[in-house]
Amino acid sequence: MKVVIVTSVASLLDASIQFQKTACRHHCNYLSMQVVKEIEEFGTINEKNLEFDTWKDVIQNDEIDALVFYRVKQISISTGVLYKSMMRNRTKPISMYFVRDCLAFDGDPPSFRMTSCNINAYNRSKIKDLIILMNMKTCNKKIIGEFIIDNFGSVDALLSIINSNVTWITSVINNSNGRGINIRVSNNKMLTITSFRRFVNKLKMYKTTKCASQLDNLCTEMNKMDIIDKK
């Protein structure tokens, strides 16, 4: 399957172009897709984008089987409307994949379906690397900040991952502190909470005061949980 990756940034809160490319490439590799072109846009995507030569070359090429986006929110109009606009200049159907959302759009009648998504494994690998870096005395704030941007796009994106993987992250933190992988952490709840708080408090250095409360909320929720360490 030949595909084109489409990345776009509409605000400072969006993941960086480079992060979107990395995630999309990883997804394409996981699904054995051949990337033949990459399109970078600034702003959301709508029918007007299709008027540019870059898009015309892709849309009118029936050898292209699919477009791979980072997420659905890149498109400011209905996905079905965008699809119909593209099909006016094609003889062969084209699919759209949305990596972060683990969704695919297969055309008319408009229908989304879930796809196999391995981005979580990618994120977990990078979080392990981040925890190692944060435990190294030789890594300064600049190095860690650049690592976060290069691998997660933004601190907001990283926080979203942390929020959905609290139990796993505490397990990794515990392991990095040398406590082993088969400890029932609920028996050492205060120690676990302290380790988690220390981790997110370090991340506060990379957040503005406006966004720091999100980290506090994570710690509050953590305090309410009974956690069993898992591999």
From Swiss-Prot:
The UniProt entry lists the main location of this chain as host cell
Q: Which UniProt keywords apply?
A: Early protein, Host nucleus
Membrane-crossing residue ranges in chain numbering = none
Q: Classify the source by domain of life.
A: Viruses
Q: Which GO terms describe its cellular component?
A: host cell nucleolus
What induces or represses expression of this protein, per its UniProt record?
A: Expressed in the early phase of the viral replicative cycle.
Family annotation (InterPro entries)? Poxvirus_F16 (IPR006798)
Say which family it is in.
Belongs to the orthopoxvirus OPG058 family.
Its name, as the record gives it, is: Protein OPG061
Q: What is the lineage of its organism?
A: Viruses, Varidnaviria, Bamfordvirae, Nucleocytoviricota, Pokkesviricetes
